[in-house]
Amino acid sequence: VEINELNRVNDHIEKLMFVQGDANKTIPKFVEENPWLLVSLLYIDFDLYEPTITVLKHLLPLVPKGGVVAFDELAKKRWEGETAAFKELLDTNKIQLKRFHFEPGISYFIMGE
């Protein structure tokens, strides 16, 4: 983090922020405390149902058109909770899931496509 912060274009704006704790508690609190927040890249790596549903409920509405939402364990039997949360909150007929040719394990979609 310290190295990444060295190349900030605007020294007064943090590029990264780590929030430690239970995601089911910290994500809703973080969103409430930061009403200005927009998310251009939402990378979901929880594997389990509860934290995935929490992040989708609270952060997905903050992803604008053109923003990217990515999952690392989508449609994997071992981590079915991530897929269950995805299917519960998102209309799979309206989302065009994509994969990287260099990393087929990551699924993503672009908001508004």
Residues of each region from the PLM?
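S-adenosylmethionine/decaboxylated-SAM
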Residues: 1-113
